[in-house]
Design a protein with these regions (language model features):
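Glycine-rich anion/phosphate-binding loop at the beta-strand->alpha-helix junction
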Residues: 1-86
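Catalytic-core signal marking the mid-to-C-terminal active-site face
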Residues: 78-199
Length: 199
């Protein structure tokens, strides 16, 4: 069968996207399929390889990139949360590195070299920490000691907790209440709106 998370699939997708771009066609591709059955290292390896290659090849739209497992046969809320961090990192890696008078900060460099010897107290550093860094929701960037003291919680455990938090209070609001009322008036929908919320 198809090995959607394989390097060969990544290569084929990359080639197809580059051909579409060469001929001036808008393009859409799936990427992020994995043959893994769970939220494990294989899943991360296959998804990140395929999504990164599709993105770096210039895909206009990448679909089916988050939450699926087992060759697109299973959807996982935990995987959606993990994949959100992964896709954020991939998107961040595609950004340009702006080089201009502001980003070079030559005066700050001169002042730092001649004074404190570090940039930690500079307003510019703090500002860039807010704009230039992606802070993941569940990926762990702590030290081994901090991670151990916090209970050695892995990414799947953190993502499961985060998914439950999101689903607990989430209710779609992209359909206006008037439309929902009209739909309910025209179709026999047996489940009440308040029961559609996660318990």
């Amino acid at each position: 069968g198809m090995a959607g998370g394989s390097g060969e699939q990544a290569l084929l997708t990359s080639g197809a996207v580059q051909l579409a771009n060469f001929y001036g066609f808008s393009n859409s591709t799936i990427a992020g399929a994995t043959d893994s059955k769970g939220d494990d290292a294989q899943s991360g390896l296959e998804k990140s390889l395929n999504i990164t290659m599709a993105a770096q090849s210039g895909a206009n739209l990448i679909t089916q990139a988050a939450g699926t497992q087992a060759g697109l046969m299973v959807s996982s809320f935990t995987a959606c949360v993990i994949d959100n961090d992964m896709i954020g990192s991939i998107a961040r890696s595609l950004a340009d590195i702006p080089v201009n008078v502001d980003t070079l900060s030559l005066e700050l460099i001169e002042s730092t070299v001649n004074n404190e010897g570090h940039f930690l107290g500079a307003k510019d550093t703090f500002s860039r920490m807010k704009s230039d860094f992606l802070y993941p929701k569940v990926s762990d960037r702590t030290s081994v000691d901090e991670w151990t003291m916090a209970g050695r919680v892995d990414i799947s455990q953190k993502a499961t907790i985060k998914a439950k938090e999101i689903l607990k209070d989430y209710f779609p609001n992209h359909i206006k209440p008037d439309f929902i009322k009209e739909i309910r008036n025209n179709f026999e929908i047996k489940i009440e709106t308040h029961k559609m919320r996660s318990q």
